[in-house]
Amino acid sequence: MTHMLRAPAPALALVALALVSSAAPAAPSDPTAQDTSALQFHGFRAGARLGELDGLIHRLDGGRLRCDRARRDRRVSECRSTLRDSALGGAVKVWVSAIDSVAGVITLSAGVDAQTLDRWKRRLESRYGRVGAKPQGSQWMMQWVRRGRMLRLTWRTDRGERTASVSLVDGRVLDEWGRKRAAAASP
């Protein structure tokens, strides 16, 4: 039985990002503006529009992103897909939390062997720099932060099976959502 790492809930992502954002410079007001600090993994990047992510999944294996709108805030979409890609080690589950069709949080999760996990680590470290792996309960994680964005590689072994996930968070998208919610709630 494979134990999947859970995708962060939007509220949890906001709390985690508040800690990350406090040390980051102020974000531009346009949450979809492109710049070179965009953290990405295998073409997936937080801050991408849902159409871009759906196209990427379709190009990788022909699948599609399936989205449901939140009942409480119709601007929020929770999307899922599964893709098969040999470069990622096989079947990968994809979760996206989007606000106004822009991805604030993306999580890719898969059962991996040691070689695949090492390949994921090397790919990220060669692109973003070496960071030490840190224990987090029964899991291990490596994290990179750039200009209000975060990429985290997390892995664990449970009953002999290794599961890894990459989470990409765009604080600009989540911060803008928080500002709009606060403005709508104030009299």
Language model features with spans:
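Glycine-rich, often proline-containing surface loops adjacent to acidic residues and nearby aromatics
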Residues: 99-107
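Bacterial N-terminal signal peptides
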Residues: 10-20
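Hydrophobic/aromatic beta-strand elements that line small-molecule binding cavities or substrate pockets
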Residues: 92-97, 153-155
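Non-cytosolic coordination micro-motifs
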Residues: 27-77, 107-187
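A low-complexity, Ser/Thr/Gly/Pro-enriched, surface-exposed linker/loop concept
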Residues: 72-86, 90
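C-terminal region of N-terminal signal peptides and the immediate post-cleavage residues
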Residues: 22-26
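Bacterial N-terminal signal peptides that target proteins for export
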Residues: 2-12
